């Protein structure tokens, strides 16, 4: 999976470097990747907590 993502980033980086520049493109990608990881972990934790609360209230 990691290799496939890197290949995609290289093809996109060439296009973005001409428009935004290498620095802006790299920073934007890093922020997006971290954001997805944090949202995924927080989202799973919240759903688990909500389900437990519903079960307790029903009991």
UniProtKB/Swiss-Prot annotation:
For this UniProt record, give its keywords in alphabetical order, as a comma-separated list: Chromosome, Developmental protein, Differentiation, DNA condensation, DNA-binding, Nucleosome core, Nucleus, Spermatogenesis
Could you give a single Gene Ontology term from the biological process aspect?
Answer: chromosome condensation
Query: Could you confirm whether the keyword DNA-binding appears in this record?
Result: yes
Q: Which residues form a coiled coil?
A: none
Q: Does the keyword ATP-binding apply?
A: no
Q: Which GO terms describe its molecular function?
A: DNA binding
Localization per Swiss-Prot or TrEMBL: Nucleus; Chromosome
GO CC, alphabetical: nucleosome; nucleus
Tissue expression, as annotated, is: Testis.
Instruction: Tell me the segments the record calls region Disordered.
Output: 1-59
InterPro entries annotated for this entry? Answer: Protamine_P1
- Family according to the record: Belongs to the protamine P1 family.
Summarize the protein's role: Protamines substitute for histones in the chromatin of sperm during the haploid phase of spermatogenesis. They compact sperm DNA into a highly condensed, stable and inactive complex.
Name of the protein described by the UniProt record: Sperm protamine P1-type
């Amino acid at each position: 999976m990691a290799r496939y993502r890197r290949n995609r980033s290289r093809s996109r980086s060439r296009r973005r470097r001409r428009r935004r520049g290498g620095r802006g493109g790299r920073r934007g990608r890093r922020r997006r990747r971290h954001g997805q990881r944090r949202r995924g972990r927080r989202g799973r934790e919240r759903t688990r907590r909500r389900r437990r609360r519903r079960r307790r209230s029903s009991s």
